[in-house]
Amino acid sequence: MHVGELLKALEELGLKDNTVVMYSTDNGPHYNTWPDAGTTPFRSEKNSNWEGAYRVPAFVRWPGKFPAGTTLNGIVSHEDWLPTFAAIAGDTTVKERLLKGTTINGRSYRNHLDGYNQLDYLSGKVKESPRNEFWYVNDDAQIVAARYQDWKVVFLENRGQAFGVWREPFVELRAPLIFNLRRDPFEKAQHNSNTYNDWWLDRAFVLVPIQGLAAKFLMTMKDYPPSQTPGAFNLSKIEEQLRNAGGGK
């Protein structure tokens, strides 16, 4: 169903003013299926560590609640929609309750939600997004990069091109790459600037707070470990998963 048809149906049913509509996509384009995959001005594509893999458009409509025709430039993640939609439905404490453990509809849950309630930001009650950070996690569950405000630090780099991003490994960098996404949103300075390395050295201090945030984030995995391991095409990883599932046999 096209978006326009869905919006028209909501209006015909008298639900337009009482329905939140959010339109987005789960990841950046997959170029080898162009033109169906779309395109992006940002660097690289799905399954990389670059902005083209993670940064996507999002449109939200809630007549009378969210200001129309407004562009917001703060950091918002898809992880934020669960606590945001819960807040819209009247539950503003779901994140805190899940952290401690709670019962919902007769079922017990204890989960760590990384999302932020963006309701006040989307409605215009506050000017800044409550989210200052974003963790770039690949499909192997590796943290390949981190963002704090305008700064992005790349720990693992996928150097593949086109379908090669699926074949090439993520390379661990001894010295992470640094980008300022306000001044260099397309992450070109690394290759285009004659003075990138000098600029990097003058801003290496950025690594300290981001490494501290990364350590804090990773500590949450101790009390709230991942519930499952990601799938893999690599035979050694598949063998490891089978061995773990069989208790080492």
Q: Predicted segment positions?
A:
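Solvent-exposed, polar/charged alpha-helical surfaces in well-ordered, non-transmembrane soluble domains
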Residues: 1-4, 8, 83, 87, ...
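Metal-dependent active-site segment of extracytoplasmic phospho-/sulfohydrolases and closely related
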Residues: 1-34
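Structural scaffold positions in well-ordered secondary structure
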Residues: 3, 21-22, 57, 81, ...
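Sec-exported extracytoplasmic/periplasmic mature domains
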Residues: 8-15, 86-94, 123, 215-222
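Short, solvent-exposed turn/loop segments enriched in Gly/Ser/Thr/Pro and often Arg
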Residues: 23-31, 136-141, 150, 224-236
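C-terminal cap/loop subdomain of S1 sulfatases and analogous C-terminal strand-loop tails that border
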Residues: 29-51, 66-70, 74, 79-188
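Short glycine- and hydrophobic/aromatic-rich loop-to-beta-strand nucleating segment
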Residues: 58-60, 76
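Long, internal low-complexity/basic segments
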Residues: 148, 153, 159-160, 167-177, ...
